[in-house]
């Protein structure tokens, strides 16, 4: 069965990547796009999901966080599953997503790369063993990225905190710090420059040794492939919130 897609944010960098990959894959067909820039592509483009006339099986979103509430509300009305790859959502926006997930299956991940999710599994195991080590996360992205720290860096920090006996406090940069580092911290640092697609280093620093676990995305296509895998995963799922961990478990 061919999976019919609507790409929300189709004229953005990642939207175009997903459209290209879907066109090359016989399992998918892009039936429509949604974007504030309605420049026509190989499929009709609308300014709002409400305007879309085409029937679809899944919406893949690579847009901006302010657009998410309207997207999930309309998708819930239409009973269309949604893959959300947009980062930087506020608490209020996340609540709207959770509410919509009672009506439709929603897949949300701050990073659609399978590799970064392997990194998360590795750092969770490392955090269990290296319990007393200092932990620092350094993320690097291109100079057009607006949110800092990245959603992925926060996702990594949250995953580490899940397995520690006591949760650690997040410290964002140390620019105004004039005191010694506290042992109950996870330092999170953002670098922005050039065309860096995405790099994440997780540093475990202990007495006389340092372990660094790293992931580097070489192309935006890794996120596009992950989004298509997520779309396929959502077909037939019950309403609820799903993550890359669910996809990896399913294999």
Swiss-Prot record:
Keywords: Amino-acid biosynthesis, Cytoplasm, Diaminopimelate biosynthesis, Lysine biosynthesis, NAD, NADP, Oxidoreductase. Pathway: Amino-acid biosynthesis; L-lysine biosynthesis via DAP pathway; (S)-tetrahydrodipicolinate from L-aspartate: step 4/4. This is 4-hydroxy-tetrahydrodipicolinate reductase. The active site is at 141 (proton donor/acceptor), 145 (proton donor). The keyword NADP applies. It catalyses: (S)-2,3,4,5-tetrahydrodipicolinate + NAD(+) + H2O = (2S,4S)-4-hydroxy-2,3,4,5-tetrahydrodipicolinate + NADH + H(+); (S)-2,3,4,5-tetrahydrodipicolinate + NADP(+) + H2O = (2S,4S)-4-hydroxy-2,3,4,5-tetrahydrodipicolinate + NADPH + H(+). NAD(+) binds at residues 9-14, 85-87, 109-112. (S)-2,3,4,5-tetrahydrodipicolinate binds at residues 142, 151-152. It is an enzyme of class 1 (oxidoreductase). GO terms for cellular component: cytosol. Its EC number is 1.17.1.8. GO terms for molecular function: 4-hydroxy-tetrahydrodipicolinate reductase; NAD binding; NADP binding; oxidoreductase activity, acting on CH or CH2 groups, NAD or NADP as acceptor. Catalyzes the conversion of 4-hydroxy-tetrahydrodipicolinate (HTPA) to tetrahydrodipicolinate. The keyword Oxidoreductase applies. It comes from Caldanaerobacter subterraneus subsp. tengcongensis (strain DSM 15242 / JCM 11007 / NBRC 100824 / MB4). Belongs to the DapB family. SUPFAM superfamilies: Glyceraldehyde-3-phosphate dehydrogenase-like, C-terminal domain, NAD(P)-binding Rossmann-fold domains. InterPro entries: DapB_C, DapB_N, DapB_N_CS, DHDPR_bac, NAD(P)-bd_dom_sf. Its main location: cytoplasm. GO terms for biological process: diaminopimelate biosynthetic process; lysine biosynthetic process via diaminopimelate. It is found in: Cytoplasm.
């Amino acid at each position: 069965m061919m999976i019919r897609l609507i790409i929300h944010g189709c004229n953005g960098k990642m939207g175009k990547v997903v459209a290209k990959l879907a066109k090359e894959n016989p399992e998918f067909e892009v039936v429509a796009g949604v974007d504030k820039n309605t420049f026509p592509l190989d499929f009709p483009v609308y300014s709002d999901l409400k305007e879309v006339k085409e029937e679809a099986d899944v919406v893949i979103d690579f847009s901006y966080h302010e657009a998410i509430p309207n997207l999930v509300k309309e998708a819930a009305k239409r009973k269309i599953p949604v893959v959300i790859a947009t980062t930087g959502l506020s608490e209020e926006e996340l609540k709207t997503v959770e509410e919509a997930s009672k009506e439709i299956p929603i897949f949300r991940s701050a990073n659609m790369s399978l590799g970064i999710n392997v990194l998360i599994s590795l750092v969770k195991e490392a955090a269990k063993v290296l319990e007393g080590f200092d932990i620092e996360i350094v993320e690097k992205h291109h100079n057009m990225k607006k949110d800092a720290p990245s959603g992925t860096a926060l996702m990594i920090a949250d995953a580490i905190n899940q397995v520690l006996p006591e949760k650690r406090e997040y410290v964002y940069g140390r620019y105004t710090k004039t005191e010694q580092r506290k042992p109950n911290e996870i330092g999170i640092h953002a670098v922005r420059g050039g065309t860096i697609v995405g790099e994440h280093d997780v540093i475990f620093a202990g007495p006389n040794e340092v372990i660094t676990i790293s992931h580097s995305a070489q192309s935006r296509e890794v996120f596009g492939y992950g989004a298509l895998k997520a779309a396929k995963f959502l077909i037939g799922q019950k309403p609820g919130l799903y993550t890359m961990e669910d996809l990896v478990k399913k294999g």
